[in-house]
Every structure is written in structure tokens, then in C-alpha cells.
């Protein structure tokens, strides 16, 4: 298994697939899966390539989900090991995407290969949902594939997302949910004027201060067993012309909430609207919902993954819902149990991104054992 995982990971890393350009990564994976008897379906949307591959039939449907796109490298001269050469030094595989998440993809593919070779007539269905649009807009990737599958009445029962979930050691963290994310783009109206004649103008910054104080101090909820309390942060504020003698005519405030399952996005929107009305502000607001929160409570999938980590890696993981959003939020809409397990995340999106070769091999064995636990 070791040689296959590392070789595939290196071949994927050597393709500079900066989002949403797949650079042939999915074709490489599809060719391997097709040799095993997987049915291959391409789902291109605009400039994004997506792959839906299946082996077997019936329930349960176990999907491996991941992305071939990577974030830009930044200044390549800052890299000790070039970002697309996939060098191995002292058990570390270097390159953009090594941890996020071409290493996981390689481990998933080889784990499935090993399982299908040993169990060609396995129960249920093993599937792959792979996109090249996770790191950027996330508009034409997993979300579009999920919409297509749901429209056809297809179902995913269990989904393993290979995002780099681990913190200090491989498998110490398993993500069994994620907070929702909603952004408000708020424009508060004023009246432009000269700072020496404030009675002839209306300063939207001054008017908005009491509202902003209430907004930032508001306690949305207390969280629960699986989620921390909902958090609001102001991300951007802009007003004025840049001149020191002009009262601004408009104030722009952008804020984001990472919210738990105790509240809904509708509750958040209604609460903000009530605050704005209370403070008598003239405004317009545009909302952008990046994703609703989801939670996979301990059950078949969580138990299978925890058991796999304990038996293969000797690690008892902590279940966690922290961090940003992932494509798991879209797959959860299908009613699937979703967890995320992947390599250490300490170097993702950084210069000299890297992953332990030993960890990738272990990860492949864990994914394989998960299939055994769910299908045998």
C-alpha cells in the first residue's frame, strides 16, 4: 500500500491544479478507478470539473469526498522545496496540496483499490465525489453534484471527507460536524456634507455606533454538547471619501457569524433586522449564506471511524466541530452521516506545505478498515 499511496500523491502534487483548474488530476484518479470496475460519470459545471464514480450497488452507499484544487503558492522563492515537485525529505512529502488534500485523495483511492481487490463482490456501494472547486468559489463543485444526485433520487448514507482534520498527531481530531457561516453586507445611509456644518448632514457612522455596540455584544446562544456558542465578528468597515472635511454619506459594515445548531440563519437575519429597526437606521443589507451547520452524532459512521483509528493507529480521537466550513456541509444536505479525517493541518496553505509519508500510509489503512467495518 505504501508505494502506491505515495506515488499517487506525488503524481497529483506535480500537477499545479490551482482552483478551479484540475490539471488532469481527476482523470488520473478516474483511470485507476475504472480499471477496478468503477462506473465513471463526469459532471462539469462552467469551468469546474467534478467526478462521480461508483462500484457495487445498493445500500449502504459509502462516499469518499475530496478536492483536487489547491490554493496559490504565493512567492515560490520562499519555498525551500518547490511547491510542485513533490520532494520527500526525512519522511516528509513536500508540495502544495500535500496535506490539503492530495495526500488524503491518494490514501482514499488506494484504500478503495485494496478493499475492492479483496472483496470484488462487496455489499453496498463505494463511491467517490471529487471536485476542483473547493478552495475558491465553491459554487460549481460539490454543491452542484449534490443537487444533481438529489434530483435523480440518489442517496449517500456515509461520507468520509479527507480534509486535514488532525492537529498534533494523525487521527487525534475527527470532525463530526461544522458550524454554519453567514455574512451580512450592511449599508447604512447618511447624508453627505461638510464637517463644519454637521447640522446640514447626517453622519451614518455616529448613527450606527449604538447598533454596532449591541450587535457585537449580543449573545446568540450558549452552544451545546457538540458546538461552541455562535460567534459574530466584524470583518470590514468602510466610510468616507478619504478627506478629513467630508461627513460620509454611507457606512459599509461587513460581519460574519459562525453559528451552531442552536440557531438558524433565518433567526439571525430577523434578529439583525429587529436591531436595525430599533435604532431607527435607514439601511440595506445583503446576506450570503455559505453553509448551514451540520452534525453527525455518534452512530454507525462515527463508531466505524473511531474503531478504525484505535485498531490501526492506536489513537482515540476527539470529536470536534471547530474550524471553517468544508464541502461536508453540502453532502450533509442529502441526509448522509458525514465525518472528516485527514492529515495534520499545521502547514496547510503555507509555504513548504508537507505531510508525513508514514501518516499517509497509516491513513490509507484507516480508510480501508473503515470500509471493512461498514461493509463486512
From Swiss-Prot:
Q: Which positions form S-S bridges?
A: none
Tagged with keyword Transcription regulation = no
Give the co-factor note.
Answer: Binds 2 Zn(2+) or Co(2+) ions per subunit.
* Cofactor dependence: Zn(2+); Co(2+)
Q: Which reaction does it catalyse?
A: N-succinyl-(2S,6S)-2,6-diaminopimelate + H2O = (2S,6S)-2,6-diaminopimelate + succinate
Instruction: Give a GO molecular function annotation for the protein.
Output: zinc ion binding
Q: Which residues form the active site?
A: 69, 134
Domain of life assignment: Bacteria
Q: Which residues bind Zn(2+) 1?
A: 67, 100, 163
The top EC class, named as a word, is hydrolase
Q: Which residues bind Zn(2+) 2?
A: 100, 135, 349
For this protein, what is the EC number?
A: 3.5.1.18
Task: Report the coiled-coil segments.
Answer: none
SUPFAM superfamilies per the record?
A: Bacterial exopeptidase dimerisation domain, Zn-dependent exopeptidases
Q: Which keywords, in A-to-Z order, does the entry hold?
A: Amino-acid biosynthesis, Cobalt, Diaminopimelate biosynthesis, Hydrolase, Lysine biosynthesis, Metal-binding, Zinc
Listed GO biological process terms: diaminopimelate biosynthetic process; L-arginine biosynthetic process; lysine biosynthetic process via diaminopimelate
Metabolic or biological pathway = Amino-acid biosynthesis; L-lysine biosynthesis via DAP pathway; LL-2,6-diaminopimelate from (S)-tetrahydrodipicolinate (succinylase route): step 3/3
What is the stated purpose of this protein? Catalyzes the hydrolysis of N-succinyl-L,L-diaminopimelic acid (SDAP), forming succinate and LL-2,6-diaminopimelate (DAP), an intermediate involved in the bacterial biosynthesis of lysine and meso-diaminopimelic acid, an essential component of bacterial cell walls.
Q: How does it assemble?
A: Homodimer.
As for family, the record states: Belongs to the peptidase M20A family. DapE subfamily.
**Name of the protein in question:** Succinyl-diaminopimelate desuccinylase
- Organism in which the protein naturally occurs: Actinobacillus succinogenes (strain ATCC 55618 / DSM 22257 / CCUG 43843 / 130Z)
Print the organism lineage: Bacteria, Pseudomonadati, Pseudomonadota, Gammaproteobacteria, Pasteurellales
Amino acid at each position: 500500500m505504501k508505494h502506491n499511496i505515495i506515488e499517487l500523491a506525488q503524481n497529483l502534487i506535480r500537477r499545479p491544479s490551482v482552483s478551479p483548474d484540475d490539471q488532469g488530476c481527476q482523470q488520473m484518479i478516474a483511470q485507476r478507478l475504472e480499471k477496478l470496475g468503477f462506473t465513471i460519470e463526469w459532471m462539469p459545471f462552467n469551468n469546474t470539473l467534478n467526478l462521480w464514480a461508483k462500484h457495487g450497488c445498493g445500500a449502504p452507499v459509502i462516499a469518499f469526498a475530496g478536492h483536487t484544487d489547491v490554493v496559490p503558492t504565493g512567492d515560490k522563492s520562499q519555498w525551500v522545496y518547490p511547491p510542485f515537485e513533490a520532494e520527500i525529505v526525512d519522511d516528509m512529502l513536500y508540495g502544495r496540496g500535500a496535506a490539503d488534500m492530495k495526500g488524503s485523495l491518494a490514501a482514499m483511492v488506494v484504500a478503495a483499490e485494496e478493499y475492492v481487490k479483496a472483496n470484488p463482490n462487496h455489499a453496498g456501494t463505494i463511491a467517490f465525489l471529487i471536485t476542483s472547486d473547493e478552495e475558491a468559489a465553491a459554487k460549481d463543485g460539490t454543491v452542484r453534484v449534490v443537487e444533481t444526485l438529489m434530483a435523480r433520487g440518489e442517496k449517500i448514507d456515509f461520507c468520509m471527507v479527507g480534509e486535514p482534520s488532525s492537529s498534533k498527531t494523525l487521527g487525534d481530531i475527527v470532525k463530526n460536524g461544522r458550524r454554519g457561516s453567514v455574512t451580512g453586507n450592511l449599508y447604512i445611509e447618511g447624508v453627505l456634507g461638510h464637517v463644519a456644518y454637521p447640522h446640514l448632514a447626517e453622519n451614518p457612522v455616529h448613527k450606527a455606533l449604538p447598533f454596532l455596540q449591541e450587535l457585537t455584544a449580543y449573545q446568540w446562544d450558549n452552544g451545546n454538547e457538540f458546538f461552541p456558542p455562535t460567534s459574530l465578528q466584524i470583518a470590514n468597515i468602510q466610510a468616507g471619501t478619504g478627506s478629513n472635511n467630508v461627513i460620509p454619506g454611507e457606512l459599509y459594515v461587513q460581519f460574519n457569524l459562525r453559528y451552531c445548531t442552536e440557531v438558524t440563519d433565518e433567526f439571525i437575519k430577523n434578529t439583525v433586522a429587529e436591531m436595525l429597526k430599533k435604532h431607527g437606521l435607514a439601511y440595506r443589507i445583503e446576506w450570503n449564506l455559505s453553509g448551514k451547520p451540520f452534525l453527525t452524532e455518534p452512530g454507525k459512521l462515527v463508531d466505524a471511524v473511531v474503531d478504525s483509528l484505535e485498531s490501526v493507529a492506536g489513537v482515540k480521537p476527539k470529536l470536534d466541530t471547530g474550524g471553517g466550513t468544508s464541502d461536508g456541509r453540502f453532502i450533509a444536505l442529502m441526509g448522509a452521516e458525514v465525518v472528516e479525517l485527514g492529515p495534520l493541518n499545521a502547514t496547510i496553505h503555507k509555504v513548504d506545505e508537507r505531510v508525513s509519508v508514514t501518516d499517509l500510509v497509516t491513513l490509507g489503512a484507516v480508510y480501508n478498515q473503515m470500509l471493512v467495518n461498514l461493509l463486512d
